[in-house]
Curated annotation (Swiss-Prot):
Active site per database record: 162, 252, 286, 464
Name of this protein: Betaine aldehyde dehydrogenase
Co-factor: note: Binds 2 potassium ions per subunit.
GO biological process terms, semicolon-separated: glycine betaine biosynthetic process from choline
Enzyme Commission identifier(s): 1.2.1.8
Gene: betB
Organism: Pseudomonas putida (strain ATCC 47054 / DSM 6125 / CFBP 8728 / NCIMB 11950 / KT2440)
Annotated family: Belongs to the aldehyde dehydrogenase family.
Amino acid sequence: MARFGTQKLYIDGAYVDAGSDATFEAINPATGEVLAHVQRATEADVEKAVESAERGQKVWAAMTAMQRSRILRRAVDILRERNDELAMLETLDTGKSYSETRYVDIVTGADVLEYYAGLVPAIEGEQIPLRESSFVYTRREPLGVTVGIGAWNYPIQIALWKSAPALAAGNAMIFKPSEVTSLTTLKLAEIYTEAGLPNGVFNVLTGSGREVGTWLTEHPRIEKVSFTGGTTTGKKVMASASSSSLKEVTMELGGKSPLIICADADLDKAADIAMMANFYSSGQVCTNGTRVFIPAEMKAAFEAKIAERVARIRVGNPEDENTNFGPLVSFQHMESVLGYIAKGKEEGARVLCGGERLTAGDFAKGAFVAPTVFTDCTDDMTIVKEEIFGPVMSILTYETEEEVIRRANDTDYGLAAGVCTNDITRAHRIIHKLEAGICWINAWGESPAEMPVGGYKQSGVGRENGVSSLAQYTRIKSVQVELGGYNSVF
């Protein structure tokens, strides 16, 4: 018997059975335990969710800005009241350490919802004078029914990042969580209903991206799709979204981000930043700075500091708050990461730390991979070029600023980048030349609600968070008003 039984779909403000008996398993990657049997949505369920969302969206959009704001703020309050419960469920489902989910995942997701709840009354149009007797005004109107498709690494946080601006602008959202980690998004749907969100304004459909995701993105009455995931899948989603209608799209995709450490940097601080850029959340963060560039003359000292810090990582049961490094999200993903590690060894990179699956004692039950650091890396190695999405750092050396900027930009990705230096002029000079959408100077990883998040090149389209994201969930209607006479040319 699974701990959480059978998980149903969430449509029109309630849990409902899917149109078929098909289910998939939610598995705890730390132990292999089956947590739940999750129902697979059918195409008929998708249609039911769209119809429900259309009804709910009309009710939601007709409310005043202050009414919508109050409901979203109530959802924030409930999220914070249930923080620990939701965090533990996220830990069980993803394998992320409770020390992380308790203080980050729900907390930061609630912050984003609170941020957009505060912006609801600020959605406004413009008045543009033309001449004494005529002017134009604009209205920002909601799109209608939107779709969010989440990744498996930050399930509830991503659902909040996508739903917060969508709902704030008066839209409805149908959300499809990753098949790997579906549980907390269903709880979010409950919370929205409890807070007073009209039925149908936030529906959750569980199932595979190939089926449920495609049915949603190809649906002609969906107005926007916001997707987080890999670049290859993102391209398919974009093509699918335009196959039946011209939909708005936001894509937050993959990365192979550079962290450049300059010769004048505080090496201890740089090592701390490199650790956060590679091993936070067991390395499963899209913005990770996995290509660490260090001046050649500083390499040995930097390696020593990294090895010392890796030895202090507390790998263990993610339910234990003392643990700060848990398993990977699934056994399938573990095999993918181990394949990259094997490739790194085969291509001549030197293993400084880790480089193996952990199998001692209870580790054997889970998808645990040791924090891994490769050094003596070159730009043409597979581990340097491809996104691994795991706890694998690659150390590379460089000689000049011009060289490292060129090499940092020599990638199809452009999600994030960082610079460590005590020279603020150099910091800005380098950052301004890096082809990345999210950049940090002497820091890594923080993405507050106010900060637009998104990539260059094949790392994404559009932005999440920040004021500009709210506008992406509206469309502008322009209205010209003539107060005087009208002269026809006929």
